[in-house]
Amino acid sequence: MEHKDNSKMYGTTILCIRRNNNVIIAGDGQVSLGHTVMKNSAKKVKRLANDTVITGFAGATADAFTLFERLEGKLEKHPGQLLRACVELAKDWRMDRYLRRLEAMMIVADKSVSLIISGNGDVLEPENGIAAIGSGGNYALAAAKALCESNDKFSQNMTLEYIVTTAMNIAAEICIYTNNNIIMEKIED
């Protein structure tokens, strides 16, 4: 994510992996203001809709909390319909002059679908069950794909938690806006 304003808080890694009817969203704990680490233990993942939806955000913190509130409202209006709630949020994001200025992205998931809601108001479903956003997202995505797509016996026995933790730690080693304080939320079948 390009940092347009060094007075805003940016930078994170959010990773979502879906496997065998289980899904985890993980986020690191670092909050940066410009080039300064302001906090190491921020919680960027949370549960919504009576714990049936998990979500993580990247981008400007205040903007992300605005989107969380809007998404919660859409989920209340369309209970059990995550895709519809996200599409409705995306419509608002595109149409509303205030929302269009928000600098954040989200990954949301329930028991059946994982979605990325982009800063442009797009709703995308990852093809392979792996999604990542934020400054370290590409590193976490590459590591997670490598771990999930490996065909050796060891990789077949790796837990979802192990894959997520390993991928997030690799991202933290590379991305200066990501740390190793990983917080996860999981929905199990």
Swiss-Prot record:
GO molecular function: metal ion binding; threonine-type endopeptidase activity
Presence of the UniProt keyword Cytoplasm in the record: yes
Family as reported in the entry's similarity comment: Belongs to the peptidase T1B family. HslV subfamily.
Record's subcellular location: Cytoplasm
One record GO biological process: proteolysis involved in protein catabolic process
UniProt keyword Nuclease, yes or no: no
Annotated catalytic residues: T12
HAMAP family: HslV
One term under GO cellular component: proteasome core complex
InterPro entries given in the database record: ATP-dep_Prtase_HsIV_su, Ntn_hydrolases_N, Proteasome_sua/b, Proteasome_suB-type
Pfam family for this entry, one: Proteasome
Activation/inhibition comment: Allosterically activated by HslU binding.
Main location: cytoplasm
Name the UniProt record assigns to this protein: ATP-dependent protease subunit HslV
Gene that this polypeptide is encoded by: hslV
EC number: 3.4.25.2
Subunit structure: A double ring-shaped homohexamer of HslV is capped on each side by a ring-shaped HslU homohexamer. The assembly of the HslU/HslV complex is dependent on binding of ATP.
Reaction(s) the record says it catalyses: ATP-dependent cleavage of peptide bonds with broad specificity
Superkingdom of the source species: Bacteria
Sequence positions that bind Na(+): A172, C175, T178
